[in-house]
Amino acid sequence: VLGPIIGGFFAGADSILGITGWRWVFLVNVPVGLVALFIVARTLHVSHFARPSAIDWWGAFTLVVGVVPLLLVAEQGREWGWTSPNSLTAYAIGVAGLIAFIWVETRMGNAALIPMRIFKDRTIAIALGGGVVVGSGMFGGMLVIPLYLQIVHGATPMDSGFQMLPMVLGMMIASVVSGQLMTKTGKVRIFPIVGVLLMVIALLMLSRISADSDIRGVMALMFLFGLGLGNTMQPLTLAVQAVVDPRDMGMATSAATFFRQMGGTLGVAVFLSVLFNSVSDNIKNAFVAAAKDSSFVAALSDPAVLANPTNKAFVTALSTQDTSAFGNVLADSSVINALDPRLAHPFKVGFATSMDLVFLLGAIVCAAGLFILLFMPEVHLSSRSAQQRAADDAAARAAGVAGPTTGAQRTVTHDLVDAVTAEAGGHSLDELPDASEAYQTRPRS
């Protein structure tokens, strides 16, 4: 809830303690992270059983080689040119790195950074693949909303943070409600599908807004978009956690976040490229249309307007067909708020038109993600933890029973595992992370 507001406050500050304001958006996470680390260390007490394992150094190295060049070209591609030698080199290195990563992971087995075996599960493969696509459209669309509020409606960074609270509220409500419903029903599949559908609807409606749209209507659409976000992100992660082998729980959870963030990074880069590649032409078209507007024409010769140096410099550049006036605005959009509203309106129309295109592309990408998620099988949440499931399954195998156990049978296996683990060190069933290994190493009687 506080994130957009605090971020807006820092972004709007020139300097805090001698440090540029926007840098505090990152620095503030340091003390917050330290406090969170302290709380976790003091309150979270989970039994740890050390197991010998190899570190997948080659997997980590090839993943970095594959991802970093792609992130670099995503960040710099608009400046370099998407088909420039620098970009093509980054593409080649990135693809080669990812191919090498897959080759390494298939040979590392259980020690792999991301074991390839998890992709054999249809639910995991679809959740991760859909997460990449949805993340691309989701983060791309989210990025444009504050730009619309600040450039088109003239909001300060902090004001735009307040205006985005409906989206945060929608996320909170949807997260809580979907969490309660998933707990009661044990079903997950429907929630990300509904969530992405809501995002598609919200983005389609956002693609219809203009420079003159009522901010209250825009905030209502942000709330709808937030409802979609709240129904999507956590359920997709839960779907992966529900079906993955307990020993792969941490890896699969981090992989789900990683894939979604990677999709978001690429989406942001592509959508920003679309925005700024189209905005110049849209602004020029808006000024051509404004030349037929009597109020705009009157402002060009209004002495009160020309008394402002910013207005006068812009009108002079416009009358001499100096295109640098447009470039200055693209380099620093805050100039728009310094202009007379009649002179600034074509700029806002041009930006709004380009943003509409980005919202539309976001809706199309999210719709593609929705199509992928439709193929995800139903996932049923378990009332037992991953540790308990692993222990019960191991106990069933030790007792000569195939598969997971329930009911009275589960009571017997609990007693059996407790007896064996007590002999091994006094740990109870719920403390046992992977009882299967204990039975594999103990001789059968």
Q: Which residues does each predicted region cover?
A:
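Helix-loop-helix hairpins in multi-pass membrane proteins, especially solute transporters
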Residues: V1-G59, P85, L169
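Hydrophobic/small/kink-forming positions within alpha-helical transmembrane segments
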Residues: V1, I5, V64, M172-I173, ...
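C-terminal membrane-cytosol helix-exit motif in multi-pass small-molecule transporters
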Residues: V30-H48, V64-Q76, G94-M108, G369-E378
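Transmembrane core module of solute transporters
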Residues: P31, W58, L72, W80-M251, ...
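Transmembrane-helix exit segments and adjacent C-terminal regions of multi-pass membrane proteins
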Residues: V35, I39-R42, T83, W103, ...
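Short, Lys/Arg-enriched, Gly/Pro-containing loop segments at transmembrane-helix junctions
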Residues: F49-S53, N110-R117, I283-A289, V379-A391
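Small-residue-rich alpha-helical segments with characteristic i,i+4
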Residues: L2, G12-S15, G141, L147, ...
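Extracellular/lumenal inter-transmembrane loop segments of multi-pass membrane transporters
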Residues: G8-G21, G77-G81, I151, T156, ...
